């Protein structure tokens, strides 16, 4: 059986980001590969030195994606030693809009921007304050009074935070005559 080795979740200093690893290994063979962090989050929000890298690996049959994984493991790597690990703490800004901040989760709207690929984007900061994985989703979303679902979902590992964007494509906004965004209403669930 050929196995696929992948990273399901990656964190740097408690900030969830995208660690990319997808390596197939044929029966009886070995492979060396690297995990790439393809995420501007680490630079855009000054995460600092990588003092605590959390990785959740999953190994599964390449030819049967519906089969249960043959291995799932999570590890932490402390490049400077575990005693030097630093957890990221985001400082609030005057432009923040706190949507929710309770014992379970925190969601903060940081602002908006236009992205050439994703379209109109609401930038958010989210924290999972629990010891279980949370799925953040949006419901009943409207732009300028027109229903416009961004089809948003973000799975956030226990005790981590992340920066993300909730986006609407140009075509979605054009269909709803909402090229100029004046108001957005939505329910965010975790």
Stretches found by the model and what they are:
Residues 10, 25, 55-57, 136, ...:
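Fold-core signature of tandem repeat domains
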Residues 117-123:
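Short, solvent-exposed loop/turn segments enriched in Ser/Thr/Gly
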Residues 15-71, 146-189:
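Short, solvent-exposed, Trp/other aromatic-anchored flexible loops in extracytoplasmic proteins
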Residues 84-116:
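Low-complexity, acidic Ser/Thr/Pro/Gly-rich terminal tails and inter-domain linkers that flank the onset
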Residues 9-10, 37, 126, 140-141, ...:
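Hydrophobic beta-strand positions in extracellular immunoglobulin-like domains
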Residues 1-2, 125-131:
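Asparagine-centered strand-capping/turn motif at beta-strand->loop junctions
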Residues 12, 102, 143-144:
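Structural motif
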Residues 68-89, 190:
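Short beta-strand elements
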